[in-house]
Amino acid sequence: MLYNLLLPHIHNSHIANLFHYITFRSGLAIIITLSLSFITGPILIKFLRSLQKNGQPIRSDGPESHQTKAGTPTMGGIMIILSSCLSTLLLADLTNKYIWITLFGFISFGIIGFMDDYAKVTKNNHYGVRGKSKLLLQGIISLIICILLEYLDKNPSHLLNVPFFKNLSLDLGYFYIVFAIFVIVGSSNAVNLTDGLDGLATVPIAFTAGSFALISYLVGNLIYSNYLQLTYIPNTGELTVLCAGLVGSCLGFLWFNAQPAEVFMGDTGSLSLGGVLGIISVITKHEIVLAIVGGLFVIETASVILQVYYFKATKGKRIFKMAPLHHHFEKHGWAESKVVIRFWIISVIFALIGLSSLKLR
């Protein structure tokens, strides 16, 4: 909004000219989302506590230390969604189609998560909305997003770029739409599975969003994309502002979500954040890089899949003491804070590997 209002004056005012730069607006987005989180956080937490008498239901079969979390309110993802959307609407170019498509997906996945959290709180159990129903809704939203991208792009690309290899890409044809839906839905649920400990998912999400802030900027810049031999996608640079807002809102949320958490982001936050990262990876054509940068989310998801299939195949045996993987280490005797910090370190390593693919070809 500010960008669009100040655009006619960029040549007449030094302040207005600053808003011409994506980097300036991205930095401002981090400051604004952090500030909004600090201001609205205590108010929202107090409001959620007044509505949720018992807070988020705690699994009885989980680590014993988790029983101390009883009464902690959920749906804190509302804070992240509101601050991110407000900063984006304030600082991004509102004529950019990618901004509106991404915000649509972000909010839609947030609504699905809210429905799930609401069901858990009102029913006082951890089951929420049926898994198949959530997958169906996620699939429908992802399909709508893919159709919008196909319709609004003059020359939609169905190429899948392979990182670390020069000029290597696979033409998936219209099967790319199915693949894109898988990426978006998979990313949403992978982040959701990772969000099981205080602060665990928040920092890796911030690292991933920060990585895609850089990727969006480079892919949307003709000079940098040609230099790095990346697929140039015009207008994706504005997504840098949105990604920066995600970084700031996640860090602001971490202020209240650090152990011991005052609030959980819930599915409202995890499904929306995972979904928006998947959408941005599809738009920037860096779907495989998302799996690398967000490698922690992939590992957590793989641990659940392996546990379920092995349990069924062996009629009751388990690979891990508990899935997702972070609970396995808790059951193994690791303190929650140690699991969280070590997983943060792993997420940094994955982010660096993923970003190195931009240059190493």
Swiss-Prot record:
Its cofactor is Mg(2+). GO terms for biological process: cell division; cell wall organization; peptidoglycan biosynthetic process; regulation of cell shape. Keywords: Cell cycle, Cell division, Cell inner membrane, Cell membrane, Cell shape, Cell wall biogenesis/degradation, Magnesium, Membrane, Metal-binding, Peptidoglycan synthesis, Transferase, Transmembrane, Transmembrane helix. Its EC number is 2.7.8.13. It is found in: Cell inner membrane. Belongs to the glycosyltransferase 4 family. MraY subfamily. It comes from the Bacteria. One of its GO terms (molecular function) is phospho-N-acetylmuramoyl-pentapeptide-transferase activity. Pathway: Cell wall biogenesis; peptidoglycan biosynthesis. Catalyzes the initial step of the lipid cycle reactions in the biosynthesis of the cell wall peptidoglycan: transfers peptidoglycan precursor phospho-MurNAc-pentapeptide from UDP-MurNAc-pentapeptide onto the lipid carrier undecaprenyl phosphate, yielding undecaprenyl-pyrophosphoryl-MurNAc-pentapeptide, known as lipid I. It catalyses: UDP-N-acetyl-alpha-D-muramoyl-L-alanyl-gamma-D-glutamyl-meso-2,6-diaminopimeloyl-D-alanyl-D-alanine + di-trans,octa-cis-undecaprenyl phosphate = di-trans,octa-cis-undecaprenyl diphospho-N-acetyl-alpha-D-muramoyl-L-alanyl-D-glutamyl-meso-2,6-diaminopimeloyl-D-alanyl-D-alanine + UMP. The keyword Cell inner membrane applies. The chain crosses the membrane at residues 28-48, 74-94, 99-119, 133-153, 168-188, 203-223, 236-256, 263-283, 288-308, 338-358. This is Phospho-N-acetylmuramoyl-pentapeptide-transferase. Pfam families: Glycos_transf_4, MraY_sig1. It is a multi-pass membrane protein. GO terms for cellular component: plasma membrane. InterPro entries: Glycosyl_transferase_4, PNAcMuramoyl-5peptid_Trfase, PNAcMuramoyl-5peptid_Trfase_CS. The keyword Ribonucleoprotein does not apply.
